[in-house]
């Protein structure tokens, strides 16, 4: 076993945690259905090489921008972003995401006005916004688990900054346009009264 996911209601003894830890198995305390990660018992990494490299790249503004450009190049493979500033990169990404929303809305015939998200009122959003929120939370949980398992820091982001999950958002953004956005619109298109987001 490489990782043990412990969900709500799990009861585990100190001795069991000790034995599991001795085997090198990671333990992750997760939310319902394994979506959110709340704590990690042990990283899969046995060295600090990733976090040291990450800290070096984040701490130098020139290197940080170079990494951000590479991340954006993954999203815009046909565009030259080599001379763009961080502000220009962020603006380009915003335009691209709005275009993806519009295209998915047309593809699935789902009404779309804008992204609306209130963390205190999930049910208050329309179906497509609820589906986007749920899909993104699942993606964040997956990315978070991988980042900490590899021994990198969730908070040392290159594009996103100032949040304890900045790097999680950076990585998740690489995949949203191909994964969570199309999935959310497909779910919204097929949603019925008896379904649960």
Describe the residue ranges of each PLM region.
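Glycine/small-residue-rich interface belts in oligomeric ring/scaffold proteins
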Residues: 2-48
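Active-site helix-to-loop segments that bind/position phosphate- or nucleotide-bearing substrates
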Residues: 36-197
């Amino acid at each position: 076993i490489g990782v043990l996911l412990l969900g709500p209601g799990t009861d585990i003894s100190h001795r069991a945690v000790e034995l599991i830890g001795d085997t090198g198995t990671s333990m992750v305390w997760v939310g319902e259905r394994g979506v959110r990660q709340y704590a990690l018992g042990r990283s899969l990494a046995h060295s600090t090489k990733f976090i040291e490299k990450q800290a070096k790249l984040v701490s130098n503004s020139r290197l940080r921008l170079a990494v951000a450009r590479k991340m954006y190049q993954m999203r815009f493979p046909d565009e030259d972003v080599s001379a763009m500033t961080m502000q220009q990169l962020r603006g380009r990404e915003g335009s691209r995401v709005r275009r993806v929303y519009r295209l998915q809305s047309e593809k699935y015939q789902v009404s779309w006005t804008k992204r609306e998200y209130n963390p205190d009122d999930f049910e208050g959003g329309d179906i497509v916004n609820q589906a986007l929120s749920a899909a993104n939370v699942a993606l964040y949980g997956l990315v978070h688990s991988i980042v900490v398992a590899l021994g990198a820091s969730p908070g040392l982001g290159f594009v996103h900054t100032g949040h304890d999950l900045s790097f999680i958002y950076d990585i998740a953004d690489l995949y949203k346009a191909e994964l969570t956005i199309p999935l959310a619109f497909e779910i919204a298109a097929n949603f019925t009264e008896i379904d649960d987001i």
